[in-house]
Amino acid sequence: KKKYSNIELDNQEKKMVLAFKDRLINLNIQILKYNIYPIFITQIQYDGLRDHYLFLIIQELKKFCEENDYSIIALDEITSEFDKNDFYDTVHTTVAGSKKIAKIIYPTLVKILKQIGL
């Protein structure tokens, strides 16, 4: 399994990560309350994961999923097939970009759904 970075965070990064962790805790309360089986998918950008803050958020999401035994499709780890024309801006995909993502995640999504009996 992939290990997480142990880089030293500055105060702003710590604050941002802590706020994200709090949102994950609140989300987990709802997941458990309503007996939801979540499937998380990591976010990518047109230039990969050069955004340090996005990297930190994804790292926390992966830890959260591992700790709670939730499924996650780590799109950031399984593809680098995108170019600038697949995005309207740094994060929002065009129709072509969305189709690429769908083709990439579909096999894993089907596998997860079969595992949970859907």
Each language-model region and where it sits:
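Histidine-centered active-site loop/cap adjacent to the catalytic His
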Residues: 70-71, 87-118
